[in-house]
Amino acid sequence: MTVDPASHITIPEADLARLRHCNHHDPHGFYGWHETEAGSVIRTRQVGATQVNLLIDDTSHVMTPIGDDIFAIDLGHRERADYRLEVTWPDQEPQVKADPYYFLPTVGEMDIYLFSEGRHERLWEILGANIKTYQTALGTVRGTAFTVWAPNAIGCAVVGGFNGWNASQHPMRSMGGSGLWELFIPGIEEGEVYKFAVQTREGQRRDKADPMARRAELAPATGSIVASSEYQWQDSEWLRERSQTDLASKPMSVYEVHLGSWRWGKNYEDLATELVDYVADLGYTHVEFLPVAEHPFGGSWGYQVTGYYAPTSRWGTPDQFRALVDAFHARGIGVIMDWVPAHFPKDDWALARFDGEALYEHPDWRRGEQKDWGTLVFDFGRNEVRNFLVANALYWIEEFHIDGLRVDAVASMLYLDYSREHGEWEPNIYGGRENLEAVQFLQEMNATVLRLHPGALTIAEESTSWPGVTAPTWDGGLGFSLKWNMGWMHDTLEYFSKNPVHRAFHHSELTFSLVYAFSERFVLPISHDEVVHGKGSLWDRMPGDTWNKAAGLRTFLAYMWSHPGKKLLFMGQEFGQREEWAEGQGLPWDIVDGWQGEYHEAIRTLTRSLNGVYSDSPALHTQDFTGEGFTWNKGDDATNNILAFTRFGSDGSQMLCVFNLSGTSQPEYQLGVAAGGEWKLVLNTDDAEFLGAENDIATSVQAAATPRDNFAYSLSLHVPAMSAQFYSLQK
C-alpha cells in the first residue's frame, strides 16, 4: 500500500531520519497516540514485523505500514482510549503488548530537581531499570522504566535481546535540560539483559552498561540485568540495636575477606554457612569484604568498579548476597564492605566518556586521571556525579543492610598532586594542593550516612597526616567514623621483622604510635595490602626458625589486640599462612593439618582466645580513643626489649599488658603498677595451649607496696622470651 507522504499519519522526513538513526530527543512526539487537526493517529515501530493490529474498543484494526518498519492508523476524531498492539513477526505467533509510547514519564519534576541539585537520596529508585506496574482500562501493565543520565548525547535507546539490540526499536525521550533520558517498556521483566545505546555528538553509537544497574552479567559479558528483590530480611532487631550503638566503646575485631579466594569455588550461598560459622567460631565482631561491586577484572580484587550498584555476579545473585549479610547479622556479626569512590576503570562499555564526553570523570586530565593505576577520577564537583556516589553509599546500607563502608584510597582524593609530578596538577582556587571538591563530597557523604543511618560506619583508608579525618563535619572534619592507622601498621611490622638482637636500636618504632594514638579514632589494620606484592605474609616477616616465627607472630597478635584502636586482620593471617595471598586460589587450609601444622592451629587458637579476652574485657575496648584509657608502665626498656602498659576501662577495670620481645626470659622482672591487690593472668602467649615454651607462670600475682617507675605499687613477674601476658586487676 502506498501512503501519501503528506498524509497526517506519516512522519516528516527530517524527523524520520533522526528516529531511524536514534538521535531524536522526542520519539514520543511521533510514536504512540497523537491528536492532529485531521484526527487521532497512532504510530509504532516494530522492526521486522509483517503485520500490526490495533486492539481498541474490543475491535481489531489493521495498521498501515508507512516505511522504516513503522505502522500507523488514522482513528478519526475521537477521545483518547487505552489500546494494545498485536504484532506478528515471520514464523511466530502474534504477540499482544502495550505500547511503550503510550505512557507518561516515569520521572517526576521533583526527582529531576533533586538530581540536578545533587540531593536525591534514593537515586536508584528513579535512574537505571525499575520494574513498575500500572493499572489501565484494559488491565494491568507490568514492565520496566529505564532512565539514564547522558546530557551530551543526541539520542539514547534501550537495547537488548528483546529487540534484537536494535536501537531504533526503543528510543528514549529527553527530559529537557536535566540530561536524563527515559522510557517505560511494558513486558520487560526481571532477568532481561540490556544496555543503553548512546548516540554521541560525533555520530557514534556507544553501547553502555547501565551505571545504576542492580545486577550485571557474569564477566567477560558486560550487559546489565533487570533486577528486583523479593528478599525477606530477618535482621530488624540487629538494625535497631545498631542504630543505638556507639562502637567507640564497643569491641570491634574485623576479619577481612576476599570472598572469591577464602575457599576456592564457593558462592554466596556456601559462604552464608561456611564463612559465617568460621568467623563466629573465632569470635570476630565484624567481617569486611574486599569490594563486591561488579568489576570486570578479577585481578583488580574489585578495586576497579564498573557496576557501582550491582553485587558481583561471580558468586551469585543480589538476593543471595543479601542472605549472606543476613546470616552474619543472625550470628551477631557486622558486615563492612570496601567502597571505591576515588576512581574507576577506562573500559569503553562502562562509565568512561559515557555519552561521548567526560561525564563521570573530571574533564581536565590533571584532575581526571590516575596514571599510576590507569584509571579515571570522578568529577566530585559536579552535582550529578556527587549524587551518584552519595546515593551509592546509601544504597548499600539501605538495600543490603551493610553496616559500614571502608572508603578506599582517600589520600588520592584529598590531594590534587597525589602521585603527580610538577606540571601534572593544578592548584585549587586558593593556590593549595587540597582537592576542595573531594573534601566537600566526603563530608557530604559522611554527614548523610550519619543522618540517615546512625550506627552505620564509614572508615577511611587514609595514609597521610590530614587533620580531622574522624572529626565531625560541623567542626571542619571529614566526618569518618574511623581511620586506618597506617603509621602503626608500618612501624610495628618493621619492628617485628627485626632480629631480636637488633630490636633495641628500633625500640621507638614500637612506642611512637602512642604519641598520636588518640588524635583520631583509629583502626589497626593488617590488611590484604600487607601480604602481597613481595611483602610476604605475617609469618614470613617474623625472624628465626619455625618455633621463633610462631612465637613472634603470637606476640605480634597480642600486641595488636591490646594496643588502643579497633582491630582488622586479613584472612589467612589468623593461622599464620606462610606464603603471600593470591586471589587466584583459595587459602592454604591444608597447612593446619600438614607438617608443623600444630603451630598454625595454635596461632588460630590464640586468635580465638584474643577475641574472647578482648570482647570480655572493657579495659581493652571501652576507651580506645582517649588517653584516659592508657598509661605506660614500662616504655623505655629498649635494652631488654620489654614493653608494658595498662589499659583502663570506663568501668574502672584495668588490664596490664606485658611484652618480652627478646630471646631472653626475665624470671623476676620488676614492674611498677598503678594499683595494689591481685593481678590475675588472663592470657599468656607462651602457654602450652599455644605451643609456647614456658608454662610455669603464676596464674595471679599480688602487688607489693613498693614504689617503682613512678607507681606506688610493683609486681615481680616471670616474663618468658618472645611472649605476651595480660593481667587483669581483681576488684
Curated annotation (Swiss-Prot):
One of its GO terms (molecular function) is 1,4-alpha-glucan branching enzyme activity. It catalyses: Transfers a segment of a (1->4)-alpha-D-glucan chain to a primary hydroxy group in a similar glucan chain. It comes from the Bacteria. Coiled coil: none annotated. Keywords: Carbohydrate metabolism, Glycogen biosynthesis, Glycogen metabolism, Glycosyltransferase, Transferase. Its EC number is 2.4.1.18. GO terms for biological process: glycogen biosynthetic process. The active site is at D408 (nucleophile), E461 (proton donor). GO terms for cellular component: cytosol. Pathway: Glycan biosynthesis; glycogen biosynthesis. Gene3D superfamilies: Glycosidases (3.20.20.80), Golgi alpha-mannosidase II (2.60.40.1180), Immunoglobulins (2.60.40.10). InterPro entries: A-amylase/branching_C, Branching_enzy, GlgB, GlgB_N, GlgB_N_E_set_prok, Glyco_hydro_13_cat_dom, Glyco_hydro_13_N, Glyco_hydro_b. The keyword Transferase applies. Catalyzes the formation of the alpha-1,6-glucosidic linkages in glycogen by scission of a 1,4-alpha-linked oligosaccharide from growing alpha-1,4-glucan chains and the subsequent attachment of the oligosaccharide to the alpha-1,6 position. PANTHER family: 1,4-ALPHA-GLUCAN-BRANCHING ENZYME (PTHR43651:SF3). Belongs to the glycosyl hydrolase 13 family. GlgB subfamily. NCBIfam families: branching_enzym, PRK05402.1, PRK12313.1. Monomer. This is 1,4-alpha-glucan branching enzyme GlgB. It comes from Corynebacterium glutamicum (strain ATCC 13032 / DSM 20300 / JCM 1318 / BCRC 11384 / CCUG 27702 / LMG 3730 / NBRC 12168 / NCIMB 10025 / NRRL B-2784 / 534).
